[in-house]
Amino acid sequence: MGQKARSAAAALAVASSEQKNNALEMIALSLEAHSDEILRANCLDLEKATQNNLKAAMVDRLKLDELRLAAMIDSVRQVARLSDPVGQIMSAWTRPNGLHISRVRTPLGVIGIIYESRPNVTIDASSLCLKAGNAVILRGGSDSFHSSYALHCALVQGLEHSGLPKSAIQMVGTTDRAAVGEILKGLDGAIDVIVPRGGKSLVARVQSDARVPVFAHLEGLCHIYIDKSADLDMARNIVLNAKLRRTGICGAVETVLIDNEALKKFLPVLTALQEKGCEIRATEDIAFLVPDVKLASEEDWSHEYLDAILSVKTVEGVEGAISHIKRYSSGHTESIIAEDMEVVKKFFNHLDSAILLHNASTQFADGGEFGFGMEIGIATGKMHARGPIGVEQLTSFQYHIKGNGQVRA
């Protein structure tokens, strides 16, 4: 499998933009042609999820329907419309001796993707890797096995119709956990980068055991700070969206911090959440003012709920918010709601998370919303890829140096 992937990666590295875009269109057409089979396979996974009492957030990630599948197919076509990063000149300069140096984007090579109950990752990872000239080896979880297998069959058929090697997109055909171990070892040097998509335990194992570079985040644990200068209606709309639009994604807010000088002003934000069925866990000063609020424990500040539950705390201005976030944040995404630009500037300058937002929902922490077409994850590390991993983040670079006979003294 590893050697087939390396061979395919070599072919993709020199494939033209037209060839890659044609392959993506063939994949989209194949997915459309096999939609019924894909949805039937997904039903098998959903039945198994029900039998295994899978959590609601996991079931939501697992579920496919006609609308979600259509959106996935559309995202393949969006990737085809993106600029091809391969061959782009990132920077160029000429040295005093006449040497002309260019830094040029190149494919990474072979990407290993390890994921759980997220059949969409099968499509997202394959499309982005193909566009960036990379081969991909997919290892889906047992929860999404039937869905991922059906999607992979359609992907391979699309590749075959395009003329590109079908081994450019391979899937590990077993749910045996030993297969994960082999991928983490790099398949004898075949894999260049691993991207995990799944729960905290999966990502932690990958980061601990991988012998090749990893692009990943351990968990979401996103924060919103509401400053005393914030507009109430804006704060209410943003927090409702950030928590409840989709509770089971890594960009969902888990903790809201409120300026203690304006707590009463923003209590309607909390009552609006409760009216939508959200459980509030908060500090005593908030529980005293808002009915049916549970007292937050120390564990709540570091817990990723992925559910309609929210931790809320009052803080002493933006400095208090920064202090709390630095202590508990996973480095994923933080948002500030404020009209005072000096406060916003301080928030941005003192926090080091991968994504910082001003007056916007944390659920914009998504490659599609960034204009990347789609993403295969959010990276919170500081080396190479950071934030949404889109097509550009799946490239490396070379230095191309042109001379006219220069030799070094």
From Swiss-Prot:
Alphabetized UniProt keyword annotations: Amino-acid biosynthesis, Cytoplasm, NADP, Oxidoreductase, Proline biosynthesis
Pfam families noted in UniProt: Aldedh (PF00171)
Top-rank lineage group of the source organism: Bacteria
Reaction catalyzed: L-glutamate 5-semialdehyde + phosphate + NADP(+) = L-glutamyl 5-phosphate + NADPH + H(+)
Record EC number: 1.2.1.41
InterPro entries: Ald_DH/histidinol_DH (IPR016161), Ald_DH_C (IPR016163), Ald_DH_N (IPR016162), Aldehyde_DH_dom (IPR015590), G-glutamylP_reductase_CS (IPR020593), Glu-5-SA_DH (IPR012134), GPR_dom (IPR000965)
One record GO biological process: L-proline biosynthetic process
Enzyme class at the top of the EC tree: oxidoreductase
Cellular component terms per the entry's GO annotation: cytoplasm
GO molecular function: glutamate-5-semialdehyde dehydrogenase activity; NADP binding
SUPFAM superfamilies: ALDH-like
PROSITE patterns the UniProt entry points to: PROA (PS01223)
Pathway recorded for this protein: Amino-acid biosynthesis; L-proline biosynthesis; L-glutamate 5-semialdehyde from L-glutamate: step 2/2
Subcellular location: Cytoplasm
Family per similarity comment: Belongs to the gamma-glutamyl phosphate reductase family.
NCBIfam families tied to this protein: PRK00197.1 (NF001221), proA (TIGR00407)
Annotated HAMAP family: ProA (MF_00412)
Job of this protein: Catalyzes the NADPH-dependent reduction of L-glutamate 5-phosphate into L-glutamate 5-semialdehyde and phosphate. The product spontaneously undergoes cyclization to form 1-pyrroline-5-carboxylate.
The protein, known as: Gamma-glutamyl phosphate reductase
